[in-house]
Amino acid sequence: MNYLNELKKLEILHVDNYQYIESKKLNKDEYLLHQGEKLNYIYILLRGKVKVNHINANGNSMLCSFNSPYSIIGDLEFITQSPIINNVIAYEDCICATISLSKYHEILMNDVFFMKAIAKNLASKLSKSTQNQSISLNYP
C-alpha cells in the first residue's frame, strides 16, 4: 500500500503502529459510519471526500461538513468511547486507512503521534464549526 509512505511522512502514528493499518474502499454514496452505532474502527481518509450529516430528533438531516484526505474519522467517538454521533457517507469514491479498535484501542491511546493527530483534527473541526456558526448567526 503506497499510502503508508504518505501517512508516515505526516507522522500520524508511531512508526511501530503502521503495521495495524488495513485499507477500505468505499463507493460513492456508501456509508462509512452510521449515527448511533458503535465505532469499531478509526479511519484516516486517504483519497476522495466524505460528507458528514446528522439526523435530528425530528428526522431532518443537517449537513455538518465535508472531509478531505488525511482527516481522521471517528476521532471524537474514539476519545469519548461514545456511539457514533454523525453519519459519514462517501461523497465520491474513497480509500481509507482503517485500524480495528477492538484489537488496538489501547495501543492507539498510548501513541503520542496518534493522539497529537487526533488533537489537531479535533481543533480543525472546532475551528470550522465556529466559523460556520458565526456565518449562520450573522446571515440576515
Annotated model-derived regions:
Residues 30-92:
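Cyclic nucleotide-binding regulatory domains
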Residues 104-105:
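A generic structural signal for short hydrophobic patches within well-formed alpha-helices
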